[in-house]
């Protein structure tokens, strides 16, 4: 029988992790897969092991003189990444998670701007890190690798050293008292480094967000979560902490192409992802259903089960067992965030018995602002605002649409060394998100687009590019698209809604094997013009790739 979680409010991550280590001591916190040729080994790290390794590694960081300093973490999602990041948080070392995909110039610039004195990194980044080390442009004194490599400190040597120091009586790291209000994480927003902003977050804000999430979403200590979202993103790292606060086991994927295999291999029950991942899961399964000629049957059974559900008869997981098995067999809960999810996809998951909710948040809000839950789901919305937050719509238009602004403990401290940009978005304690939306009579929040992307036509009509992009992306022939406003050549006071489309070469060749390049473009344009769009579109620029 599944045991309901006990939700406790903490104001820092250290107390939260100590509570979890005590409550879920022998539960598995992380499982790591080690491949050696054809042989595969699974290493389980319990909650007790995790806290021990954090304290051992953190103690070594203190012995290196990093107390009160800053340390970067860069690499793929793994147990070592989690330990390095959490060791920073529990010891008052500002953690700077960085994107492993940055070019060397961008990575070096981020390291300089964040003023880190240590970096913990993945072996795959060895050449880049070595070049940065040799350049001498950063303040980094300690280069620590997850793997044993010449010229770098070894992660597990530091764990061994820290263990010995603690056994010899060293307790400075373990006894450190976290300041919940101080900057604890420095996160760069997405975009090129020259334009990205370094967001300062504190532990009280993150811990409050975790508490709010646990109050409205249901997690069990028997759940298994797969860490697809990169930990250097706030959505990924806070998601990791939500799982640790709930006693959940986290496993790591082998890559997007192995998603279905991994879901089955680990018996994954909870999946937190962005729409592109969730769309991929949906489309893969539905293509197989179509191939088997079962599309009409599935659609009929969805209508039937939804009707029975209104009578409080739930047959979904029995009737759609084959579809659920294609998602590993144990999937029960999916959380989507980071971008709008196609309404069809969300309805499909819920219709087959997998609870899917959408959330909305930003790096600057640690991150979740609102989310759907078991009892609060409304099509097209991103749920109800989190309990610790005040959310309102600023400068509403006639339709009640305006900028979403937020106030509460999980709002950032500001942008690091950028008072001007901080003052642009933080006014009287309210964070101005730059997102447009509205709150309906029931308190549900709806996102309509980005303020800076909004296209306003001469006749006053407002066009939200994101809505059109979702619609166009539904076409099988379309791989991706981009909607934007283009000045009207005939009227300088007006704009035209323009579209750029990348077509799916595999699909188009399969459906239209004898079509020329121009004929394919004509076919796609015809498909787009038949969409239910109440605005005139310029004929799109259609190509194979952006």
Feature roles, as predicted:
Residues 26-78, 82-86, 103-108, 163, ...:
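Conserved AMP-binding/adenylate-forming core of the ANL superfamily
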Residues 16-17, 90-161, 495, 505:
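Structural core segment of the AMP-binding/adenylate-forming
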Residues 207-224, 231-320, 330, 355:
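Conserved AMP-binding/adenylation subdomain of ANL enzymes
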Residues 25-28, 163-188, 195, 218-224:
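Conserved pre-ATP/AMP-binding loop-to-beta segment of ANL
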Residues 43-48, 184-210:
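Conserved AMP-binding A3 loop
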Residues 271, 315, 319-445, 451-454, ...:
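Conserved AMP-binding/adenylate-forming
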Residues 119-121, 408, 413-414, 436-535:
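AMP-binding/adenylate-forming catalytic core of the ANL superfamily
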Residues 36-39, 127-179, 285-322:
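ANL superfamily adenylate-forming
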């Amino acid at each position: 029988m599944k045991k309901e979680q006990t939700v406790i409010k903490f104001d820092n991550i250290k107390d939260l992790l100590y509570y979890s280590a005590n409550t879920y001591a022998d539960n598995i916190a992380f499982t790591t897969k080690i491949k050696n040729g054809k042989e595969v080994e699974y290493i389980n790290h319990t909650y007790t092991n995790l806290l021990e390794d954090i304290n051992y590694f953190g103690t070594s960081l203190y012995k290196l003189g990093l107390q009160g300093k800053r340390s970067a973490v860069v690499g793929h999602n793994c147990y070592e990444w989690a330990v390095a990041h959490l060791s920073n948080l529990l010891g008052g070392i500002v953690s700077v998670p960085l994107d492993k995909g940055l070019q060397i110039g961008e990575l070096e610039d981020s390291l300089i701007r964040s003023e880190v004195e240590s970096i913990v990194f993945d072996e795959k980044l060895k050449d880049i890190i070595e070049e940065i080390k040799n350049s001498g442009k950063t303040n980094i004194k300690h280069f620590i690798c997850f793997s044993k490599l010449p010229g770098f400190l070894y992660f597990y040597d530091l764990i061994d050293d820290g263990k010995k120091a603690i056994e010899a009586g060293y307790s400075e790291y373990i006894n450190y008292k976290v300041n919940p209000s101080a900057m604890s994480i420095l996160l760069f927003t997405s975009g090129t480094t020259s334009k990205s902003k370094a967001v300062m977050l504190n532990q009280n804000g993150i811990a409050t967000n975790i508490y709010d999430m646990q109050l409205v979403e249901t997690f069990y200590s028997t759940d298994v979560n797969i860490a697809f979202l990169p930990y250097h993103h706030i959505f990924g790292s806070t998601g990791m902490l939500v799982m640790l606060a709930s006693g959940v086991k986290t496993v790591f994927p082998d890559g997007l192409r192995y998603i279905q295999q991994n879901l089955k291999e680990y018996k994954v029950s909870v999946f937190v992802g962005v729409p592109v991942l969730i769309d991929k899961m949906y489309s893969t399964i539905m293509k197989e259903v179509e191939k088997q000629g079962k599309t009409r049957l599935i659609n009929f059974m969805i209508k039937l089960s939804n009707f029975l559900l209104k009578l409080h008869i739930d047959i979904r997981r029995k009737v759609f067992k084959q579809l659920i098995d294609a998602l590993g067999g144990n999937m029960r809960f999916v959380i989507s965030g980071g971008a709008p999810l196609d309404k069809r996809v969300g309805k499909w998951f819920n219709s087959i018995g997998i609870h899917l909710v959408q959330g909305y948040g930003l790096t600057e809000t640690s991150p979740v602002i609102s989310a759907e839950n078991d009892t609060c789901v409304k099509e097209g919305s991103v749920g109800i605002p989190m309990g610790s937050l005040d959310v309102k719509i600023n400068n509403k238009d006639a339709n009640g649409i305006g900028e979403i602004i937020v106030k509460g403990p999980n709002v950032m401290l500001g942008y690091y060394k950028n008072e001007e940009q901080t003052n642009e978005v933080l006014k009287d304690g309210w964070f101005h998100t730059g997102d447009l939306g509205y709150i309906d009579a029931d308190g549900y929040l709806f996102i309509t687009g980005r303020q800076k992307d909004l296209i306003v036509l001469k006749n006053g009509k407002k066009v939200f590019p994101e809505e059109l992009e979702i619609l166009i992306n539904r076409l099988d022939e379309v791989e991706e698209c981009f909607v934007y406003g283009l000045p009207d050549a005939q009227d300088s006071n007006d704009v035209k809604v323009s579209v750029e489309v990348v077509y799916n070469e595999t699909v188009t060749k399969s459906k239209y094997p004898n079509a020329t390049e121009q004929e394919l473009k004509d076919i796609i344009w015809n498909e787009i013009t038949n969409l239910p769009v109440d605005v005139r579109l310029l004929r799109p620029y259609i190509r194979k790739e952006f």
